[in-house]
Regions:
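Hydrophobic/aromatic-rich core segments of domains that either
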Residues: 80-147, 154-158
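Short, low-complexity Ser/Thr-rich regulatory SLiMs
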Residues: 97-99, 146-148, 325, 348-354
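N-terminal accessory/pre-domain segments preceding catalytic cores
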Residues: 1-29, 87-89, 149-262
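Extended, compositionally biased flexible segments
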Residues: 44-104
Length: 397
């Protein structure tokens, strides 16, 4: 090991401590906050290094690049780098493989501290440390449930935004350095998802900030905000993720820089409920059901799916809505028109994921709203307003 643990700790704004669980937790959280999960460095490494045996960005390369340009890496690189850092600080660690989609496509660490093993999965990454024997884990971003399996520990997300893989397995067997490197090298196959597109992710307190396909997504425990970046993506992403803009620009030149599929930002709130998806939608799927939902916050006039809403006792104020139901998609698409002519698109819908039912409320904003990348108060206030509607809906179930 030739990288300086002192320099890395300085960059992470942490002091060296004796190995302990609180120290491990601080290192884990700060690593996920400051060291981005990103594919840009992998894309550049693949293009610049022709020898397959030398393509993996081993810890010395990983930490040098982090200190120089703010890059991080993807699964195997992150696990190896965090392992080297922990080992340099005196922690007892061992590497293990796992499964997200196929066996051995994932890696993580087991760390022994205080007579107990913990899974430090910085490769996915999970939002918190997981007991090696299983258990329930609450974090600001999502709750996790871990249970022992025949091969190791299965981990599933039981809350949070219902998107992406919601289950993974960490195998208990220790993987040798030789086997770890062999599997790592295989991740440089030409069709690898991390070589064909620039993707970025880091934790920011109670939020996960992600970038893919031209848009930034900000996820918290109950909502997702999608913000399209319509211009100067390398520069804007450098500001958000702390990665050198030239690194991002070069990665985009190799992997492509597609335009976002949306032009207007949108905020989506989610609420998990113990209800059949069809019955959940049926509660608001008729004009009477929708009126009943909205009568809790406004006076409602009109017929069918064309309605007018106004504050109690102020019929001259308010707005009009035209609702389009989609029974097959379990959704209501709403066009809201204010007196000055401004229009807002909203939706209610029901989604099912891994056997769980989610009530969903979405608002499409006007414009890209890049200000929401910095103004978390405004983002949270808008998401909170949508969440209130979901709570009202849930009372009818």
């Amino acid at each position: 090991m030739s990288f300086s643990t002192e320099d890395v700790l300085d960059a992470l704004e942490l002091a060296a401590e004796k190995p302990s669980f609180p120290c491990l937790e601080k290192l884990f959280d700060r690593f996920n906050a400051r060291v981005p999960f990103e594919s840009a460095s992998k894309i550049l490494r693949n293009a610049e290094v022709s020898d397959p045996n030398e393509k993996p960005r081993v810890p010395d390369v990983f930490w040098r690049d982090f200190l120089d340009s703010g890059t991080g890496g993807t699964c195997f690189a992150r696990v190896a780098a965090f392992d080297a850092l922990l080992s340099g600080l005196g922690f007892s660690t061992r590497r293990a493989l796992g499964r997200v989609e196929t066996d051995f496509d994932h890696a993580a660490l087991f760390v022994e501290v205080g007579g107990r093993e913990w899974i430090a999965d910085v490769g996915f990454p999970l939002p918190g440390l997981v007991p090696g024997s299983g258990g329930e884990v609450e974090t600001e971003i999502a709750a996790l449930s871990a249970a022992e399996t025949d091969r190791g520990v299965g981990v599933r997300f039981v809350s949070g935004v219902p998107d992406g893989p919601r289950r993974l397995e960490i195998f208990r067997a220790t993987v040798s350095e030789e086997d770890f490197l062999a599997l790592w090298r295989k991740t440089f196959r030409p069709d690898s998802r991390f070589l064909t597109a620039v993707s970025l992710m880091r934790r920011d307190g109670p939020r996960m900030i992600k970038f893919a396909r031209g848009e930034v997504r900000v996820d918290d425990l109950h909502s997702r905000t999608r913000i399209p970046l319509l211009a100067e993506r390398a520069r804007r992403l450098s500001e958000v993720f702390g990665i050198d803009a030239d690194v991002l620009a070069r990665a985009f030149s190799l992997a492509g820089d597609p335009e976002p599929e949306i032009r207007d930002a949108r905020i989506t709130a989610y609420l998990s409920v113990d209800a059949d998806p069809g019955k959940a939608f049926a509660a608001i799927a008729t004009p009477d059901g929708y009126r009943r939902l909205m009568e809790g916050v406004a006076d409602v006039a009109g017929e069918g799916w064309k309605l007018r809403f106004s504050p109690p006792g102020a019929a001259e104020s308010g707005f009009e809505e035209e609702v389009t139901p989609d029974a097959g998609g379990r959704s209501l698409e709403i066009r809201r028109v204010y007196p000055e002519g401004r229009e807002v698109r909203l939706a209610f819908r029901v989604e099912e994921r891994d056997g769980a039912t989610y009530l969903v409320r979405e608002a499409i904003l006007s414009g890209a709203r890049e200000d929401l990348l910095k103004n978390d108060y405004a983002r949270g206030r808008l998401a909170g307003t949508l969440a209130v509607d979901l709570l009202a809906w849930s009372r009818f179930l």
